[in-house]
UniProtKB/Swiss-Prot annotation:
Its cofactor is Zn(2+). The gene is nrdR. PROSITE patterns: ATP_CONE. Keywords: ATP-binding, DNA-binding, Metal-binding, Nucleotide-binding, Repressor, Transcription, Transcription regulation, Zinc, Zinc-finger. Binds 1 zinc ion. It comes from Psychrobacter arcticus (strain DSM 17307 / VKM B-2377 / 273-4). Residues 49-139 form the ATP-cone domain. Negatively regulates transcription of bacterial ribonucleotide reductase nrd genes and operons by binding to NrdR-boxes. Belongs to the NrdR family. It comes from the Bacteria. This is Transcriptional repressor NrdR.
């Protein structure tokens, strides 16, 4: 691994530990040339299915797009980065376990919603409002009633 500070190839691993529910290995490294320390993350490279959009267009899976769509409703919520990364890993794992070469964006959206629902109700409603295209306040009330069926 080359040092990001001086580009030397003489680096060593100081510490390794699992992250994101075991889906990543976090490594602290030290450069033997400039003595700077840096962190790297190691993940298994897997092939994700392609995404079939509602228009019928087929796109390659985009981890960054998934991440952006999840991080937006989680803004200013008390969710740690580790919890966010773990949720992203669970979503990707569920999609891979389907064993399909192509998955509809609707199925992916429902998986995201189910994960958000278990993580944070506010983030879930934020995501649902965009995903389900809420047109008025009644749609918000209905969705909140669905996640809290015992409240009147």
């Amino acid at each position: 691994m080359h040092c990001p500070y001086c580009n030397a190839s003489d680096t060593k691993v100081i510490d390794s530990r699992l992250a994101a529910e075991g889906a990543q290995v976090r490594r602290r490294r030290s450069c033997n040339s400039c003595q700077e320390r840096f962190t790297t993350f190691e993940v298994v490279e897997v092939v994700m299915p392609r995404i079939i959009k509602s228009s019928g267009k087929i796109e390659p899976y985009d981890n960054d797009k998934l991440r952006r769509s999840i991080l937006l409703p989680l803004q200013k919520r008390p969710i740690t980065i580790d919890e966010q990364e773990a949720m992203i890993s669970r979503i990707e794992k569920r999609v891979r376990q389907m064993g399909e070469r192509e998955v509809s964006s609707k199925v992916l959206g429902e998986i995201i919603m189910s994960e958000l629902k278990t993580l944070d109700d506010v983030a879930y409603v934020r995501f649902a409002s965009v995903y389900r295209d809420f047109q008025d306040i009644d749609a918000f009330h209905q969705e909140i009633a669905n996640i809290r069926p015992n409240d009147k």
